[in-house]
Design a protein with these regions (language model features):
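Conserved N-terminal beta1-alpha1 strand-loop-helix module at the mouth
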Residues: 1-75, 79-109, 144-145
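Active-site/ligand-binding-proximal alpha/beta "capping" segment
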Residues: 109-148
């Protein structure tokens, strides 16, 4: 089982130290998720982390950071995002229905299911899947080690 963590959407004091500690403790995959933020702040956070962890970091948005810091890959948060022209590397994505899951599993290295539950912090972000949806997808073999 791989340990994957998504950052808080906002930056906070000593975030770099906490992330470095998580990597030292065995974190396999960090998703750098800082929507609506200037890329300079993500660059600053990355520059504070030891380079040996860069190949375990997947970036949401600001896709140029993948090449600049030799990160693990990019993540597409929704269907409106596209893979940058000429991009070669690991791609993951978030799907919000079973049809998207079928399609994304064929194209991406791995997929997040979002949202499984109603969000506590974002009241408008409600669950996208019912228990029946998830059980049917599991029976169909759609939910496996490539689905988080």
């Amino acid at each position: 089982m791989k340990l994957a963590i998504m950052t808080k959407p906002t930056f906070f004091v000593e975030e770099d130290k906490i992330l470095a500690t998580l990597f030292e403790a065995g974190l396999d995959n960090l998703h750098l998720y800082k929507p609506n933020s200037s890329p300079i702040y993500s660059e600053r956070l990355l520059s504070l982390l030891p380079e040996k962890f860069y190949d375990k970091i997947t970036v949401h948005g600001h896709f140029y950071l993948k090449e600049e810091y030799r990160l693990a890959g990019i993540h597409l948060d929704d269907n409106s995002e596209t893979v940058p022209n000429g991009y070669k590397g690991r791609i993951s994505g978030t799907c919000r229905n079973i049809d998207d899951l079928r399609m994304m599993k064929k194209k991406y290295s791995y997929v997040f299911l979002g949202n499984i539950f109603n969000s506590i912090s974002l009241p408008t972000a409600t669950s996208c899947f019912t228990m029946n949806d998830l059980e049917a997808a599991a029976k169909e073999g759609l939910i496996d080690k490539k689905v988080y």
